[in-house]
A protein has these predicted regions:
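Short, intrinsically disordered N-terminal pre-domain segments
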Residues: 1-5, 9
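Detector for the mature cores of small, proteolytically processed
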Residues: 11-110
Length: 110
């Protein structure tokens, strides 16, 4: 998914009350640990984390900064900062609510 498409969908989820962004793959939920730009500059990779994730507003600000620096490039999901061999594409963004917490899931393409 392109950076601006992801940003638009996160903004839409935020308007529904989404507070935190998570990565969802095979029914497992991960936080977003860090963001890496590829050496050739044609994509960025969100690295999965088992720790807490990031608030939607903060993540939108990160995407805005990346867009102004490197433009509307592909956003991928990865598990490792050293290799991009297993990076996966984003399939969709999903809104969910658990008790009082409203969250957004970045669903990974398998």
């Amino acid at each position: 998914m392109k950076l601006l498409d992801l940003r638009y969908k996160l903004e839409k989820g935020q308007s529904l009350g989404g507070e935190v962004v998570y990565i969802k793959e095979d029914n497992l939920i991960y936080g977003i640990g860090s963001v890496y730009k590829s050496e050739d500059g044609d994509s960025i990779t969100l690295l999965k984390s088992k720790e807490e994730s990031v608030k939607v507003n903060d993540f939108i600000n990160i995407l805005d900064n990346l867009n102004s620096d490197i433009g509307d490039i592909e956003v991928l999901i990865g598990t490792d900062g050293y290799t991009r061999l297993n990076d996966k594409e984003i399939k969709s963004i999903e809104f969910a609510q658990y008790e009082t917490i409203k969250m957004l899931f970045i669903n990974v393409q398998n």
